[in-house]
Amino acid sequence: MKAIHFTEMLRQIDQAYQHRALVDVYAYKGETGAIIHYRGWLVHHVAWRQGFIRLRNPKNRELRTMPQIFIIQINNQKIYL
């Protein structure tokens, strides 16, 4: 499994947003610290300055907002700072 830097992850998220590509994201849940897997979600919005990302489920259009720092893996690539 390949590891990428946090800024490269931001570039990949931005490219997925521009090309409407599906992403596979593992992220921590803020309240409990549990790891949640978002498989095949679309990037709905990216807020670079606020540090948040919004993902949308293409099947039921559910939206999830998460801090970018909580993402630990994207498209089978680990994230390091």
What is the predicted function of each stretch?
Residues 30, 44, 52-54, 64:
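Classical nucleotidyltransferase
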